[in-house]
Amino acid sequence: VTPENPEDPFEGYLTEHGYASSTPTTDGQRVYAFFGKDGVHAVDLDGNRLWQTSVGTQSSNRRWGSAASLILHEDLVIVNASEEQRAILALEAETGKVRWRAEGAILELAYGTPLITKDADGQNVLIVIAPGEIWGLNPTNGKLRWYAAHSLTGNVCPSVLVRDQIVFGFGGFRSSGSFAMKLGGRGELGKDAFIWQSRASSYVATPLLHEDHLHWLDDRGIAWCIRASDGKELYRQRVEGLQATGRPVYASPVLAGDHWLVPSRWDGVFALALGSTFQLLAQNRIPDDASDFNSTPAIDRGELLLRSNQTLYCLRSDTKS
C-alpha cells in the first residue's frame, strides 16, 4: 500500500509498533485492513484492491498512531478512528461509504478495539471504552444508548471484555485500574451499574477471561490473576526470566488448552497455568530472531501463529505431524 496521507513522524512509541498495527478482518468475500491516516482498505480474496476510505488525518497529543482493529457487523466495517478524527465510524462493506459516525472529544487516546455483544434487552450493542467514559452504541446507526463515567483516565489501550451481561474494562495512565459493570439501561448510568472497581490494571494488553479468572502479564513483567466475580486479587507474581524494565510485554494472552500463553517482547513466549495459583510452565525462545515480539498470537487448529517485527512463524506441537 502506497501512503496517500502524511503519517506521524517515525519516532517515540511509533518505532515500537509502526503504521500497520491493526489486525485485518474478513467476511469471506473481502479482506479489510486499517492503516491509520491512510484509511481503511478492502481487497478481494485474490488481493485485488476494491476500495479505500480515509477516516481522518488528525493526531492525538501523544502522536502514537493507531492500534485498534476493525470489526464487522452485518454489512458494516466498524473502525475506531479516535486518533484520526475522534470518532467511531461504520463503513459499508461493499463500497467503503461512511454509513454513520459517532464523535466525541473524549475519544482521544481511546486505543482499544470496540466489541459488539447483546445488551440486557437482547439488542446488539457496540461497546467503546475511552478515558473517563464507556459507551454503548447501536451498531446499526451509531446512536448512543447508554454511557457511564469511570475512573480510568489518561489513555486507555486494552479492549473491553464481556461475558454474561457483564463488561470488564482495564487501562488508564496515570489513573489506572479495572472495573466490572452490568450491561443494560438507557442514558447515563450511575455508580450502581458497577459491580466492582479495582486498582489492578493492564496498561496495554487485554486480559484473558477464563471461568472466574482474569489473567494477564503487565508491562512491568508481573503476572496477574484477579477474580472476575468480585475483582479480588488472587496473585501478583513477578515472572522469572522476564525483563522487568522497558515495558517487556505488549501482547495480550491467549488460551491454549489448560494454560495461557503470552509472548514477551525480547524473552520468548511464556506459558502459565490457568487457575488461582501462579505456576510458570514454560519459557520458549526463537534464538535467531532478535527483533521485538509485540503482537498477540493467534491459534488455529492446534497451530500457533506468532509474529515478530521481522518474521511470521507457524508453530505446532512436535507430537503432531
Predicted regions located by residue number:
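Noncatalytic, solvent-exposed loop/strand surfaces
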Residues: 1-321
